[in-house]
């Protein structure tokens, strides 16, 4: 079978989510042929792995803590032209590649092109419209996002929604699946072996901001605060220099989940894929949503009983030290709450089965 993936190029989370689904499909369909249409981060991520077609996408102007709605629209004022150009590009690709199904992650042009050519489509996205509680804070930005998501939910043959803490279920053509993660913790080596191989004598605090610059102020604050704690910190995927001996700064590496498995706790932004892996691996987390990013506000609303939530805008050395000291006292409580979430199988396994069922109809 042939599978065309149309994936947003914003951030790493969508890349890792779809790669996990692709790997499951390749295990189940040995003759599968994969093609990906994408841009930005995802294009660089997949360029040595699968055949690619370049499309255009939204541009986000990274700042230290927040998404500026005005700057996003200024940067993307001509996106409507890119949107229709993308549809044309994807339609040509569909006619040439002739996929059995089009799988789309957060890029509505893929659904529009598939519908125009009467191709089966599956939309994968974590926006649960039953849990949107922040409309009044985002204005036209929210309107644009919700219109796009509703269009895809309406016109796709099936919709796959990976959960965080919601109950996996089926509602019509919407399939709520387990969190989609890169690899199941049971498939990794045990913590003792990993700690020995990675060179740690005690479980570290893992810091990750997902490859964006939005959390750089947080990272710099942690670098300043680390010397006050008898903890080992790993700052993952950011090119910075440590200011104390208890901080290790690592570039982006493919074995992130090994570091996650041995970690004592995690400090992170509120990206869906990162939170999915944190919850699946049963780790206490101190979470900072990117200001004005609707998706991350939805995410923290879903996990607020299972992690400590704070605010990037208010971060300072003193406020972080107070917050982190309090967090350390509650790590056992948050770990206990994450263990109440009974995930058994990786959501990518479920998603691949749903896609294959749609293809076989």
Predicted feature residues:
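Donor-nucleotide binding loops and adjacent catalytic segments primarily
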Residues: 22-24, 182, 188-265
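A short, glycine/small-residue-rich beta-strand->loop->alpha-helix junction that serves as a flexible
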Residues: 7-19, 213-216
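A donor-sugar binding/catalytic signature common to diverse glycosyltransferases
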Residues: 101-106, 123, 255-298
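Short amphipathic alpha-helix
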Residues: 15-26, 41-42
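A nucleotide-sugar donor-handling region in carbohydrate enzymes
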Residues: 139-204, 208-213
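Conserved nucleotide-sugar donor-binding subdomain of glycosyltransferases
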Residues: 69-101, 108-109
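Conserved nucleotide-sugar phosphate-binding/catalytic loop shared by glycosyltransferases and other
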Residues: 5-9, 27-28, 32-83, 315
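Conserved donor-nucleotide binding/catalytic region of nucleotide-linked donor-dependent transferases
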Residues: 310, 315-343, 361
């Amino acid at each position: 079978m042939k599978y065309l993936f149309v994936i947003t190029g914003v951030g790493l989370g969508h890349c890792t989510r779809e790669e996990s689904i692709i790997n499951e499909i390749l295990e189940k369909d040995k003759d599968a042929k994969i093609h990906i249409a994408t841009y930005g981060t995802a294009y660089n991520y997949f360029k040595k792995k699968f055949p690619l077609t370049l499309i255009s996408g939204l541009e986000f102007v990274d700042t230290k803590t927040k998404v500026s709605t005005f700057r996003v629209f200024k940067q993307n004022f001509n996106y409507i032209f890119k949107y229709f150009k993308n549809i044309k590009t994807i339609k040509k690709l569909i006619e040439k590649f002739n996929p059995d199904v089009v799988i789309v992650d957060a890029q509505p042009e893929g659904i529009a092109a598939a519908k125009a050519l009467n191709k089966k489509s599956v939309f994968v996205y974590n926006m649960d419209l039953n849990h949107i509680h922040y409309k009044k804070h985002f204005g036209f930005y929210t309107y644009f996002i919700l219109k796009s998501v509703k269009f895809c939910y309406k016109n796709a043959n099936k919709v796959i929604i990976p959960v965080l803490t919601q109950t996996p279920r089926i509602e019509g053509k919407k399939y709520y699946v387990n969190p989609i993660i890169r690899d199941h913790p049971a498939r990794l080596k045990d913590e003792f072996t990993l700690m020995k191989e990675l060179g740690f004598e005690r479980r570290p605090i893992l810091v990750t901001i997902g490859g964006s610059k939005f959390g750089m102020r947080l990272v710099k604050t942690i670098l300043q605060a680390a010397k006050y704690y008898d903890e080992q910190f790993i700052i993952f995927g950011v090119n910075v220099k440590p200011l104390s001996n208890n901080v290790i700064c690592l570039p982006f590496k493919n074995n992130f989940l090994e570091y996650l498995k041995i970690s004592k706790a995690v400090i992170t932004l509120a990206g869906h894929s990162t939170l999915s892996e944190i919850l699946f691996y049963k780790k206490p987390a101190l979470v900072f949503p990117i200001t004005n990013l609707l998706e991350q506000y939805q995410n923290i609303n879903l996990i607020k009983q299972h992690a400590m939530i704070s605010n990037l805008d208010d971060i300072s050395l003193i406020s972080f030290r107070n917050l982190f000291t309090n967090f350390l006292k509650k790590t056992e409580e948050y770990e206990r709450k994450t263990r109440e979430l009974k995930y058994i199988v990786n959501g990518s396994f479920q998603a691949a089965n749903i896609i294959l069922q749609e293809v076989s109809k």
